[in-house]
Structure formats: C-alpha cells, structure tokens
C-alpha cells in the first residue's frame, strides 16, 4: 500500500488552528471518539490532515491536560524515564497523566537538560584544572638541572688551562702578524731607497762617450818604448816619503811645492 498524498496535494489547510476548527474537532471527538485519525477530518468536515487533528487534540484540546509548571516530582520522573526510554516522548507522556509529549519535550530541552549538563561541565572543568595542576611537574626539571653537582676542580683547572693556551696562541698569532707586517714594510722601504739611489747615480752611455772624446793635448803622456807603466803616487805614499825625508834632514833640499 502506498502512502497517502500530503496536505498540499489534497488541498488541505496548514498553519494555526482557528477557534471554529477547535470547536468542531472537540464536538466530533466527544460524540464519536477518535478511533481512526486518518478518517476523522473527513467525518468531522475539517480541511485538515489526520496528523494535524491528532496533535491538536493531544497537545491542546484534551480536557485532562494539566496547565502550568512541572512539579519537582514530575521533573524527576521525566529525568528517570529519559534515562530508560531516551527521546520517546509519547511513551514518557503515557507515564505522566495530564502531560503531553510536546510539553515534556519542551521542558526537557529548556530546563532539565541544562540542569544535567551543568554538573558535567563542572566536572570537566575540574578535571582540566587537575591537569593544569599537574603541569608544574615539568617545571621541576629546570630545578633539578640547577641542583646538579658542580664541576670538579680538575675539570675547572683544565678548562682554565685550555682557555689560557688559546688566548696565548691568539696573542702569538697577532704578534707574528705584526712582526711580519713590520718586516715587510722595512723591506719595502729599503727597496724603494735602493731604487731611488740607483736612479740618482745611474750612469748612462753619454758619460763614457764624453770621457773618451776629451782631447789629450794638455797632458804630457809621452812614453818611451822601454818604459813601463807606473801608477801615479797616491796621497799615502807621498806622506810616507815626506816623513822619511823629514827624519833624514833632507827635506830642506826639496823644492817648494
């Protein structure tokens, strides 16, 4: 069997009920009851579907419906039945005379569920707070590291020796670098002075050409074939012979120079 078409395809009304529709529904149910909700709208002369008539009767038009707030006993009963039945609101409403499933569902979502969630959230916060209190354990690690035993004197002495040796090696390197730079500068100065002196005293070819081209007329350099070349006396030789003549008394016979 197929499902009956919805209200829109059959031209039925939807939306809020009017007071006239409520009176027609109540009068029909009081006379004939509500054995078949699907056939009831046609029998009562209402342009409504069977589901809409049933919900209107159960939730609003029943004469035994309780109005007002739920008592403490009713709320405890709803909580207990919800733990057993879950969201079966019609079954829960059957255990509570005068209360509709719609009212029970509304009071559950607006009040009772929040009341039950508050302690759970508090426990969750407490659990998270307990975890936060456990975090300082990690803070003990730096303290343990700080409380480690100090280094032995031998290690400290060896470290100081190594540091001093490194410092001395660095100083020696700097000293050697300074000495090498100073020696390099001295060599450069000597080379520059040598080059300047060589440039000052450099004799070119013109000097020798001028010397060789000088005339020899003024010099009596005639030599006989048998004579040997005698070097001219030097100043030391002249002083020597002059001293000899002075001692022998023959210096008076020498001509005046």
UniProtKB/Swiss-Prot annotation:
Database matches in CDD domains: SANT
Induction info: By cold stress.
Additional comment: Arabidopsis plants overexpressing MYB4 show dwarf phenotype and increased tolerance to cold and freezing. Barley plants overexpressing MYB4 show a slight retarded growth and increased tolerance to cold and freezing.
KW tRNA processing (keyword) present: no
Subcellular localization(s) per the UniProt record: Nucleus
Record-given protein name: Transcription factor MYB4
Ranges in a coiled coil: none
Domain HTH myb-type: 9-61, 62-116
Low complexity bias spans: 141-170
Function as written in the Swiss-Prot or TrEMBL entry: Transcriptional activator involved in cold stress response. Regulates positively the expression of genes involved in reactive oxygen species (ROS) scavenging such as peroxidase and superoxide dismutase during cold stress. Transactivates a complex gene network that have major effects on stress tolerance and panicle development.
PANTHER family with a match to the protein in the record: MYB FAMILY TRANSCRIPTION FACTOR, TRANSCRIPTION FACTOR MYB15
MF (Gene Ontology): DNA binding
Predominant localisation class: nucleus
Record region (Disordered): 115-179
Annotated organism of origin: Oryza sativa subsp. japonica
Keywords of this entry: DNA-binding, Nucleus, Repeat, Stress response, Transcription, Transcription regulation
Gene Ontology terms: cellular component: nucleus
Ranges of the DNA-binding region feature: 37-61, 89-112
Basic residues biased stretches: 130-140
